[in-house]
Amino acid sequence: YVFGNMNEDDLAVGVRDSVEEDENKRNKADFVLWFTKSKFDSQELKWESPWGVGYPGWHIECSCISYKHCGEYLDIHCGGIDNAFPHHTNEIAQSEAYLGHKWCNYWFHVHHLNTNSGKMSKSKGEFLTVSLLESKGYDPVIYRFFCLLSHYRKSLVFSYENLDNAKGAYEKLVAKIAQLLKAEQGEVDKAAYDKLREGFTAAMDNDINTSLAITALYDVLKADTTPATKLALIADFDKVLSLSLIEKAKAVNEKPADTNDELPAEILELAEQRKQARCLLYTSDAADEAR
């Protein structure tokens, strides 16, 4: 049991109401590679095999797909925290028994996305899709930015208010980069570049701490160095973050001038105060910078 330091003697059988103890098991830790006796009355997908007509177990499907498309070795295997046991544990057991060597170097388990009422669950009809966000007018990159502001080992609470706060922070970030693009560039300062890049690299090396990585991005914007240096770093960081920062900033600069100068100064001030008041979201290390 490679995850969670579990002890086989402590495992309980059939604890959930939806799970019955399988009388075909010789050992409580057994799991099925190939079903010849279906759990389901209406099982339709079946194939001939050396072991009889049947279908693959849940775990073997994933091992076979990985082996076919990625080969014998995986560097990083991702999944939700609820896949760590038993699914990924069983994947390791069967894959390494077949391959005869270590299969994956790193396992990356992301914690749950929650609502205020608890964990999002497809079975409860409570789940989020990118197409749903797009239908509500959100660019998918906003959701990505929202997720990156929190560490993957922490459960993340989703609400549209929180997403709007992330949207405001992202737009402010892009606006600052847009200003850099319009500034006199100067030369890339190699020493400053290397020093600032160290902060980002250290954050990602620290258990993929994207929250600290975003902080390192804001540090670049505040740094006393040339626009050329800052833009080179932002482009470099975005190879990892995939936030389309330069692309979005260029799009901002290509837009026609807005008509804000036609609005009364009092209205503009109130709008800015309201915008600032809404940015109360983040508890991560990137929070103060995002606000």
Identify the residue ranges that each predicted region occupies.
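Intrinsically disordered, low-complexity regions of eukaryotic proteins
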Residues: 32, 287-290
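Structural preference for alpha-helix termini/caps and helix-kink/transition segments
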Residues: 119-121, 127-284, 291
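Alpha-helical recognition segments enriched in aromatics with Gly/Pro capping
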Residues: 1-179
